[in-house]
Amino acid sequence: MNTANVKAGETVMVVGVGGIGINAVQGARLAGAKNIIAIDPLENKREKAMELGATHSFASTDEAMETLTDMTRGQMADSAILTPGLMTSEIVAGGFNAVGKGGVVVLTGLNKLEEQNIELPGSIMTLFRKSLKGSLFGDCNPTVDIPRILGLYQSGDIKLDEIITRTYTLDQVNEGYDDLLAGKNVRGVVIHSHD
Ligand SMILES: NC(=O)c1ccc[n+]([C@@H]2O[C@H](COP(=O)([O-])OP(=O)(O)OC[C@H]3O[C@@H](n4cnc5c(N)ncnc54)[C@H](O)[C@@H]3O)[C@@H](O)[C@H]2O)c1
Protein backbone atom coordinates (compact mmCIF):
# COMPACT_ATOMS: atom_id res chain seq x y z
CA MET A 1 0.00 0.00 0.00
CA ASN A 2 2.75 2.45 0.92
CA THR A 3 5.82 1.77 -1.22
CA ALA A 4 4.10 0.58 -4.40
CA ASN A 5 1.26 3.07 -3.81
CA VAL A 6 -1.25 0.52 -5.10
CA LYS A 7 -4.49 2.04 -6.40
CA ALA A 8 -7.93 0.61 -7.17
CA GLY A 9 -8.01 -1.41 -10.37
CA GLU A 10 -4.28 -2.02 -10.60
CA THR A 11 -2.41 -5.24 -11.29
CA VAL A 12 0.07 -6.28 -8.60
CA MET A 13 2.50 -9.18 -8.51
CA VAL A 14 3.79 -10.46 -5.16
CA VAL A 15 6.85 -12.72 -5.39
CA GLY A 16 7.35 -14.96 -2.33
CA VAL A 17 4.35 -15.68 -0.10
CA GLY A 18 5.86 -16.03 3.38
CA GLY A 19 5.16 -14.03 6.51
CA ILE A 20 5.85 -10.80 4.63
CA GLY A 21 4.43 -11.61 1.19
CA ILE A 22 1.06 -12.84 2.46
CA ASN A 23 0.53 -9.39 3.93
CA ALA A 24 1.58 -7.69 0.70
CA VAL A 25 -1.22 -9.75 -0.89
CA GLN A 26 -3.64 -8.53 1.78
CA GLY A 27 -2.45 -4.93 1.37
CA ALA A 28 -2.93 -5.08 -2.39
CA ARG A 29 -6.46 -6.44 -1.88
CA LEU A 30 -7.31 -3.69 0.63
CA ALA A 31 -5.98 -1.03 -1.74
CA GLY A 32 -8.41 -2.32 -4.39
CA ALA A 33 -6.05 -4.03 -6.82
CA LYS A 34 -7.99 -5.80 -9.57
CA ASN A 35 -5.47 -8.53 -10.30
CA ILE A 36 -3.18 -9.89 -7.59
CA ILE A 37 -0.73 -12.48 -8.85
CA ALA A 38 1.05 -14.44 -6.13
CA ILE A 39 4.26 -16.27 -7.00
CA ASP A 40 5.73 -19.02 -4.81
CA PRO A 41 7.28 -22.40 -5.67
CA LEU A 42 5.39 -24.00 -2.75
CA GLU A 43 1.77 -25.03 -3.20
CA ASN A 44 0.77 -24.43 0.45
CA LYS A 45 1.86 -20.79 0.06
CA ARG A 46 -0.04 -20.35 -3.19
CA GLU A 47 -3.19 -21.81 -1.60
CA LYS A 48 -3.00 -19.39 1.33
CA ALA A 49 -2.46 -16.48 -1.05
CA MET A 50 -5.61 -17.44 -3.01
CA GLU A 51 -7.55 -17.71 0.27
CA LEU A 52 -6.52 -14.20 1.35
CA GLY A 53 -7.07 -12.21 -1.81
CA ALA A 54 -4.79 -13.28 -4.66
CA THR A 55 -6.68 -13.68 -7.93
CA HIS A 56 -4.00 -15.84 -9.59
CA SER A 57 -1.01 -17.84 -8.42
CA PHE A 58 1.99 -19.42 -10.13
CA ALA A 59 5.11 -21.32 -9.09
CA SER A 60 7.42 -18.85 -10.87
CA THR A 61 7.38 -15.42 -12.50
CA ASP A 62 8.12 -17.03 -15.88
CA GLU A 63 5.00 -19.18 -15.64
CA ALA A 64 2.89 -16.09 -14.88
CA MET A 65 4.03 -14.03 -17.89
CA GLU A 66 1.51 -15.33 -20.45
CA THR A 67 -1.51 -14.84 -18.18
CA LEU A 68 -0.19 -11.46 -17.02
CA THR A 69 0.26 -10.32 -20.62
CA ASP A 70 -3.25 -11.49 -21.58
CA MET A 71 -5.06 -10.02 -18.55
CA THR A 72 -3.46 -6.58 -19.02
CA ARG A 73 -3.50 -6.62 -22.85
CA GLY A 74 0.27 -6.33 -22.80
CA GLN A 75 0.42 -3.43 -20.35
CA MET A 76 1.81 -5.74 -17.65
CA ALA A 77 1.75 -5.19 -13.87
CA ASP A 78 1.65 -1.77 -12.22
CA SER A 79 3.87 -3.05 -9.44
CA ALA A 80 5.88 -6.10 -8.42
CA ILE A 81 6.47 -6.51 -4.70
CA LEU A 82 9.44 -8.83 -4.13
CA THR A 83 9.26 -10.65 -0.79
CA PRO A 84 11.23 -13.90 -1.32
CA GLY A 85 13.26 -15.48 1.48
CA LEU A 86 16.49 -14.61 -0.34
CA MET A 87 16.65 -11.86 -2.98
CA THR A 88 18.57 -12.86 -6.11
CA SER A 89 19.29 -11.02 -9.36
CA GLU A 90 16.95 -13.50 -11.14
CA ILE A 91 14.06 -12.55 -8.86
CA VAL A 92 14.75 -8.81 -9.31
CA ALA A 93 14.89 -9.31 -13.11
CA GLY A 94 11.63 -11.31 -12.99
CA GLY A 95 9.87 -8.45 -11.19
CA PHE A 96 11.41 -5.88 -13.55
CA ASN A 97 10.12 -7.79 -16.60
CA ALA A 98 6.66 -8.21 -15.06
CA VAL A 99 5.97 -4.48 -14.68
CA GLY A 100 5.00 -2.27 -17.59
CA LYS A 101 5.49 1.42 -18.41
CA GLY A 102 5.86 3.46 -15.23
CA GLY A 103 5.85 0.23 -13.20
CA VAL A 104 7.34 0.03 -9.73
CA VAL A 105 9.48 -2.85 -8.45
CA VAL A 106 9.59 -2.99 -4.65
CA LEU A 107 12.55 -4.73 -3.01
CA THR A 108 11.61 -6.03 0.44
CA GLY A 109 13.41 -9.39 0.62
CA LEU A 110 17.05 -9.34 1.66
CA ASN A 111 20.31 -11.16 1.01
CA LYS A 112 23.85 -10.79 2.37
CA LEU A 113 24.60 -7.08 2.71
CA GLU A 114 27.41 -7.10 0.13
CA GLU A 115 25.57 -9.34 -2.37
CA GLN A 116 25.29 -7.71 -5.84
CA ASN A 117 21.77 -8.82 -6.65
CA ILE A 118 20.53 -6.18 -9.06
CA GLU A 119 21.48 -6.63 -12.71
CA LEU A 120 19.09 -4.91 -15.09
CA PRO A 121 19.01 -3.30 -18.55
CA GLY A 122 19.21 0.40 -17.61
CA SER A 123 18.05 1.63 -21.01
CA ILE A 124 14.79 -0.31 -20.71
CA MET A 125 14.39 1.13 -17.24
CA THR A 126 14.71 4.64 -18.70
CA LEU A 127 12.61 4.13 -21.80
CA PHE A 128 9.79 2.42 -19.87
CA ARG A 129 10.16 4.81 -16.92
CA LYS A 130 10.32 1.87 -14.53
CA SER A 131 11.46 2.39 -10.97
CA LEU A 132 13.04 0.25 -8.29
CA LYS A 133 12.33 1.05 -4.64
CA GLY A 134 13.60 -0.43 -1.39
CA SER A 135 11.04 -0.83 1.38
CA LEU A 136 11.75 -1.15 5.10
CA PHE A 137 8.97 -2.40 7.40
CA GLY A 138 6.41 -1.59 4.73
CA ASP A 139 7.49 2.08 4.82
CA CYS A 140 4.98 2.48 7.59
CA ASN A 141 4.71 5.18 10.19
CA PRO A 142 4.17 3.13 13.37
CA THR A 143 2.36 5.94 15.21
CA VAL A 144 -0.47 6.10 12.72
CA ASP A 145 -0.20 2.78 10.88
CA ILE A 146 -0.19 0.35 13.83
CA PRO A 147 -3.53 1.63 15.24
CA ARG A 148 -4.89 1.61 11.66
CA ILE A 149 -3.76 -2.00 11.13
CA LEU A 150 -5.25 -3.05 14.49
CA GLY A 151 -8.54 -1.44 13.47
CA LEU A 152 -8.48 -3.33 10.15
CA TYR A 153 -7.79 -6.56 12.07
CA GLN A 154 -10.69 -5.89 14.46
CA SER A 155 -13.05 -5.22 11.56
CA GLY A 156 -11.92 -8.45 9.84
CA ASP A 157 -10.39 -6.63 6.86
CA ILE A 158 -6.88 -7.89 7.63
CA LYS A 159 -6.57 -11.57 8.57
CA LEU A 160 -3.82 -12.27 11.08
CA ASP A 161 -5.03 -15.44 12.87
CA GLU A 162 -5.53 -17.18 9.52
CA ILE A 163 -1.91 -16.68 8.46
CA ILE A 164 -0.46 -18.42 11.54
CA THR A 165 0.39 -21.95 10.47
CA ARG A 166 1.81 -23.01 13.85
CA THR A 167 2.72 -21.64 17.24
CA TYR A 168 5.81 -22.62 19.28
CA THR A 169 6.95 -22.25 22.86
CA LEU A 170 10.31 -20.56 23.36
CA ASP A 171 11.88 -24.00 23.93
CA GLN A 172 10.70 -25.02 20.45
CA VAL A 173 12.28 -22.03 18.71
CA ASN A 174 14.82 -24.14 16.78
CA GLU A 175 12.01 -26.34 15.48
CA GLY A 176 10.34 -23.12 14.37
CA TYR A 177 13.43 -22.12 12.38
CA ASP A 178 13.61 -25.61 10.82
CA ASP A 179 9.96 -25.35 9.76
CA LEU A 180 10.56 -21.84 8.37
CA LEU A 181 13.49 -23.09 6.28
CA ALA A 182 11.52 -26.13 5.13
CA GLY A 183 8.74 -23.82 3.91
CA LYS A 184 6.09 -25.36 6.19
CA ASN A 185 4.89 -22.10 7.71
CA VAL A 186 3.24 -19.11 6.17
CA ARG A 187 3.78 -17.56 9.59
CA GLY A 188 5.22 -19.34 12.66
CA VAL A 189 4.77 -17.54 15.98
CA VAL A 190 6.57 -18.03 19.30
CA ILE A 191 4.14 -17.63 22.20
CA HIS A 192 5.81 -16.53 25.43
CA SER A 193 4.26 -18.19 28.42
CA HIS A 194 3.56 -15.96 31.41
CA ASP A 195 3.10 -18.70 34.01
N1 LIG B 1 12.43 -4.96 4.18
C1 LIG B 1 11.94 -5.24 5.37
O1 LIG B 1 11.46 -4.38 6.10
C2 LIG B 1 11.97 -6.67 5.86
C3 LIG B 1 11.46 -6.98 7.12
C4 LIG B 1 11.49 -8.32 7.52
C5 LIG B 1 12.00 -9.31 6.68
N2 LIG B 1 12.50 -8.94 5.47
C6 LIG B 1 13.01 -9.93 4.50
O2 LIG B 1 11.91 -10.29 3.70
C7 LIG B 1 12.13 -11.62 3.18
C8 LIG B 1 10.91 -12.48 3.42
O3 LIG B 1 10.76 -12.72 4.81
P1 LIG B 1 9.65 -13.77 5.32
O4 LIG B 1 9.68 -13.72 6.81
O5 LIG B 1 8.36 -13.52 4.61
O6 LIG B 1 10.30 -15.16 4.81
P2 LIG B 1 9.58 -16.57 4.55
O7 LIG B 1 10.65 -17.59 4.54
O8 LIG B 1 8.42 -16.70 5.49
O9 LIG B 1 8.96 -16.40 3.08
C9 LIG B 1 9.73 -16.41 1.92
C10 LIG B 1 8.91 -17.07 0.80
O10 LIG B 1 9.64 -16.92 -0.42
C11 LIG B 1 9.41 -18.09 -1.18
N3 LIG B 1 10.41 -18.20 -2.23
C12 LIG B 1 11.67 -18.72 -2.15
N4 LIG B 1 12.26 -18.64 -3.37
C13 LIG B 1 11.38 -18.06 -4.20
C14 LIG B 1 11.40 -17.71 -5.58
N5 LIG B 1 12.47 -17.94 -6.35
N6 LIG B 1 10.30 -17.13 -6.13
C15 LIG B 1 9.21 -16.88 -5.37
N7 LIG B 1 9.13 -17.19 -4.06
C16 LIG B 1 10.20 -17.76 -3.49
C17 LIG B 1 9.43 -19.22 -0.14
O11 LIG B 1 8.81 -20.40 -0.61
C18 LIG B 1 8.66 -18.58 1.01
O12 LIG B 1 7.27 -18.83 0.94
C19 LIG B 1 13.42 -12.12 3.84
O13 LIG B 1 14.49 -11.90 2.95
C20 LIG B 1 13.55 -11.23 5.06
O14 LIG B 1 14.88 -11.11 5.48
C21 LIG B 1 12.49 -7.65 5.05
Predicted features along the sequence, with ranges:
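Structural detector of well-ordered beta-strand residues that form the stable sheet scaffold
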Residues: 13, 37, 104-106, 133
